[in-house]
Amino acid sequence: MYQTTAALRSAFLEFFRRNGHQVVDSSSLVPGNDPTLLFTNAGMNQFKDVFLGEDKRDYSRATTAQRCVRAGGKHNDLDNVGYTARHHTFFEMLGNFSFGDYFKQDAIRFAWTFLTEELKLPKERLCVTVYETDDEAFEIWNKEIGVAAENIIRIGDNKGAAYASDNFWQMGDTGPCGPCTEIFYDHGEHIWGGRPGTPEEDGDRFIEIWNIVFMQYNRQADGTMDPLPKPSVDTGMGIERIAAIMQGVHSNYEIDIFQSLIKKTAEILGVTDLENKSLRVVADHIRSCAFLVADGVMPSNEGRGYVLRRIIRRAVRHGNKLGATEAFFYKLVPTLIEVMGDAAKELVATQAIVEKALKAEEEQFARTLERGLGILDNALSQLEGKELDGETAFKLYDTYGFPVDLTADVCRERDITVDEAGFEAAMAEQRSRAQAAGQFDTDYNDSLKIDAETEFCGYSDLNGEAKVIGLYVDGQAVDALAEGDQGVVVLDSTPFYGESGGQCGDKGLLSAEGVEFEVKDTQKYGQAMGHIGLVKAGSIAMGQTLNAAVDKKLRHRTELNHSVTHLLHAALRQVLGTHVSQKGSLVEPERLRFDFSHFEAVKREELKQVEDLVNTQIRRNHELKAEVMDIDQAKEKGAMALFGEKYDSQVRVVTMGDFSIELCGGTHVGRTGDIGLFKITSEGGIAAGIRRIEAVTGAAAIAYVGEQQAQLEQAASLLKGDSASVVAKLKAQLDKTKQLEKELSQLKDKLAAATSADLAGEAQELAGVKVLVKLLEGVEAGALRGLQDELKQKLQSGIVVLGIAGDAKVNLIAGVTKDLTGKVKAGELVAMVAAQVGGKGGGRPDMAQAGGSEPEKLAGALDSVIPWLSERLA
């Protein structure tokens, strides 16, 4: 019964559905309602606002199978994954929840009934824990459920403070909290370990399978516990743990899901030992990585993207240990979809994107993995103690992209630790250098704290009167600004838009009779709007009334660019995939810049599709509608929110036909047709997993097209044709150039052969070895390698050193026939010469090249070759 994990999941959800619970889909691994949380790590995360009383649902009972990730931040299982039976980066949490509906009695009864009647677990294998003072829970277990008193274990404050207990749950220092009861399964006497509360409790015999939290108090800042008016229930049962019990195995890695992934990995890599811990690591990591990408996280160097990168790179390193010679990780996605069953709906929809992203990251890391591992191996082989220094760990991170936990993983296998404090110190030092390099003149107004509020009236008006409620110079409040002063003017209302959401602040003029204040920028300071600029005439005093006039032309051009970013965002998601999300933007009158998540360079044909799609929406002349609504209503309508932005309960939603709907507080055109034309000017990467598009609109786009046309016509003129024939003529010219280069190369080869024949005759004998040392003239640096090959063939057995002196530059090459590399290494020889001409170099024992910056010393350096060789050939 319920032998597969998929069947268990269905049975759990169906059991609670029959008992009046709403089956709610798993939320994203990226928490949408908690900026303090790196990843969704518990079933209750998506209901946090409900438990806090800040949100209401149309149901009071819910059940979920929630996808969770614990890697990075406070909840970090990464280091233990693969080495223990139950640590994972990704797991599914089965849960049932009551929002002021049932409480302890029903929660305990539901859990016991499901385990003992639905799953038919032997009651004698189960024991439970309760909080030490929770007599109510004890009585329910003992009197109503029938669990013997000796099988109900009271757990007190075992973590050094009041209510700090394994059996008392707290959301934070304040807020909802309460006691919990946990159900444990006894795997049998053949496994070491003791019951909860005993010295042997950390063993693997008794395993917690279900945690039932009773949220009945609201903890105040002073530590007092006030009863909640409507107590709630939050429960969680790890599906991997209960699957292990149902499938008669002890380790989670022995259940069906992991075994399928382990066997597939072994098949791809040709591994026969299925107990290899690296197989466990890979099988675990593909789950977290695939689902994170499916939920919109892309590998990068910060935040969630960096955690994903660390997990991928750890998996790739373990694949490398297993013998992987090419990208393999992404090939596990189809097997993952198969074994996850109904829980893989999001993965099915994004499979192609997930596979591409994982493959791209693996291939990128593979380019530095071997070299980085070589440096780490070398450092470890020279280690005298049992700790790797932080400097080396930082170099591996900084130069080769090795996350410190990956370095620690390699060290762990050799019983070596990493000086993490030293690593953090090196990291901090680099940050300090970067900050010092980036410091310019201080703008004291950046840190202004203004306790005032400005009403924004700039959606409908660009001109209006307002009262001065604040004046600031160099971050300090003043009573007045005189002519020539630079400062910040705060008004009680303004049509000026303060920079936010990527849109630049408005420019314009504040004026009164005899007074002019040129507004060069507008910034938000809390709820206040600061007009930054210069008093051109007169003076400004507190309480004075000014006319505020926005520069209409600049505002209009900015609006064109802002509106088109919405169209661009929607177009990118249509063409590239729904994993695309906005990561930043800059909207100015002259241009727009749009940063977005994507794992590879956007292809030329994809860029054209995006551009054409945006221009199609412009020509459709959609009316732009802006509405203020409840944030839940906006989400139901499908409005896109900017990742990382904090929104109020009431939000402004901007809609453009049926093509785009976003939360946005910025200013926009009336209709998409006002934009006129959209033209992409560049696309490129700015960080791993982050791409940037720059573009222009309206008159600027027309001017850009005109410039491109002028350049095309100029090229046509140079090629003696018209613009329609430029490509054909250019191709013909390139083909001709290629043929000429080929002929030139052949002539150079002939010349090198002739030169080598002449030079070979100049070789001298030294201790029975032919040696040729020559300062060449009239020979290009690119011909050196071929020339030394020819000379070695002519000499059959010998040593060649050639040098070329140019303008402030030296090129050197040394060649040693293979029969002599036991006595003389070309790399050592060329390095000796290069050191004398201000350079360095190296290479293989039979051929090595070098450069230098002091050509005047080359002749003397070459003279030192014979004495140097004499010592080694004697």
Curated annotation (Swiss-Prot):
Required co-factors: Zn(2+)
E.C. code: 6.1.1.7
Single GO cellular component term: cytosol
Keyword annotations of the record: Aminoacyl-tRNA synthetase, ATP-binding, Cytoplasm, Ligase, Metal-binding, Nucleotide-binding, Protein biosynthesis, RNA-binding, tRNA-binding, Zinc
CDD domains: AlaRS_core
Metal-binding is among the record's keywords: yes
Main location (coarse class): cytoplasm
Positions bound to Zn(2+): 562, 566, 664, 668
A GO BP entry: negative regulation of DNA-templated transcription
NCBIfam families per record: alaS (TIGR00344)
HAMAP family membership: Ala_tRNA_synth_B
Function: Catalyzes the attachment of alanine to tRNA(Ala) in a two-step reaction: alanine is first activated by ATP to form Ala-AMP and then transferred to the acceptor end of tRNA(Ala). Also edits incorrectly charged Ser-tRNA(Ala) and Gly-tRNA(Ala) via its editing domain.
Entry protein name: Alanine--tRNA ligase
Organism: Shewanella loihica (strain ATCC BAA-1088 / PV-4)
